[in-house]
Amino acid sequence: MSGRRGKIINPRTRGAVRNVGFRNLISDPFAISSILIGLISWVITLGGCISVQVNEDFPRFTWWGIAFQFLIILMLIGFYIYDLVDYYRNFLTASIGVAFVYSTNSANYLIYGSGNQKAAASAGVVLLSMVNLIWIFYYGGDNASPINRWVDSFSLNGIRPSPFEAAKIKAYRRSSKQTQFRGSSVKLTHSTNNLHSASENLGLDNGFYNNPHTSNYVSSTALTEFENTGPPYPSASDLPTNNNAPLRSPQLGNNTIGDTYITATTNNNTNTTMGDTMGLYADLADESFPYRVKALYSYEADSADAYEMSFEQGEILMVSDIEGRWWKAKKESGETGIIPSNYVTIIDNDTEA
């Protein structure tokens, strides 16, 4: 895939094996620019502090702050190369917070001093403090936050997945499944009552239902047997001599079908039996795209991938399943394809687009 803004090209977004390499760092403009500024600020601070120590006493604790800041920069480079930033966001936020305290404390000592050496050192620690504050704001926020999404939209690796958003989607999916299950149970109960009424009208024995008025469910075995209760074609000895007379079905065990006729259009089942049975399963499969999502960003499908689908920012799509990082979606025009999950957000059915 080409490297357009906001385009997902890193295999990690498809759940593939983690991509390790220096490219992870240089393809992220925020990471490479902030780390370079941090390194330049660190070099200025180190040079200024060395020159200050030559001429006068220098706080020893400041040296530890400078060393700690260098460790933070090295860890950031390593985490980006091995694509581990999302796994250590909390650690990075806490560590950079400590480095921010060190740098601001050193700035408080150096900025009010006199001399060119202290001026250079104070400029370095002030720049480090600013970089640390930006890092705290970025790594302390979730990937789904507006600022993080905007920053990550410039990255060639695409927008990073959000653990918070993934947990929210799973909770929403779980509640939606429970709602659909309750709705299916009501439909199943209604269809079961219809099947029972049909069996009474046909003179069937109530062997499948112990108490149809109090039982809300019917076993799959009972449904299977009921679907197959249509009589087989009668033998020649069962055929009436009058060609105009209707064909009456033979007895099935102890069940006698009194007024059910075999016709060429019933496919060995009566119209009543087939209609009720097919209606039962048709209700359960009405919605193949039950979730509504709204596009947060525009997305251009890769021409080399026939399964991807393009969409515009703010467009409303229907989604069949919300598991994984690529979802099958459907447009209002009927076009279907897969879309990246971190480019859309789930909306309620009663929410205005």
From Swiss-Prot:
GO terms for cellular component: plasma membrane. Disulfide bonds: none annotated. It is found in: Cell membrane. The keyword Transmembrane applies. The keyword Membrane applies. It is a multi-pass membrane protein. Belongs to the SHO1 family. Plasma membrane osmosensor that activates the high osmolarity glycerol (HOG) MAPK signaling pathway in response to high osmolarity. This is High osmolarity signaling protein SHO1. It comes from Candida glabrata (strain ATCC 2001 / BCRC 20586 / JCM 3761 / NBRC 0622 / NRRL Y-65 / CBS 138).
